[in-house]
Amino acid sequence: MLTGPRLLDWSESPLISMYFAVEDWADKPNIDAALWCLWPTSLNQNANIVDKVEGHYIPSFEDDELQGYTVDSLRQNTRLELFPVATIATRNNARIQAQMGTFTIHHNKKIAIEDVGDHSHVAKYIIPHASKEALAEELKLLGMTRFSLFPELASVGAILKDMMK
């Protein structure tokens, strides 16, 4: 049963997703990581969000299809339980742009993404703990760093702190 946040972050970039999967390699050296892949239109079919014309439609936060997922709607319709949906946001801030961010929104129905429907909308790849450090170093060579994904001033401080260790 899901007890976590209603809004989950995803990225359109597999490299960015891999960064987040292995970034804690030093803090959790003996724990395997996981890389999750989501097929958003397949997930949305479970919530009956389908565009028969476009076929691969993903709603944005402002679209009518997501009105039932607003905080006000959830408060007013406590007995209504809808499946999670994949959505896109306006990329109007540097972090969402840098991370190529997308989201899934959970409704009152407490269900993990991987437990929705026939499970064909998601895949989980296990990254052995012994591979996490090497993958993190390779991603750094490709420009996947904390600052490139969190382009705020606070990231500079965190990077300098790490360099001083």
Where are these regions (language model features)?
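Catalytic-core elements of nucleic-acid end-processing and repair enzymes
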Residues: 1-165
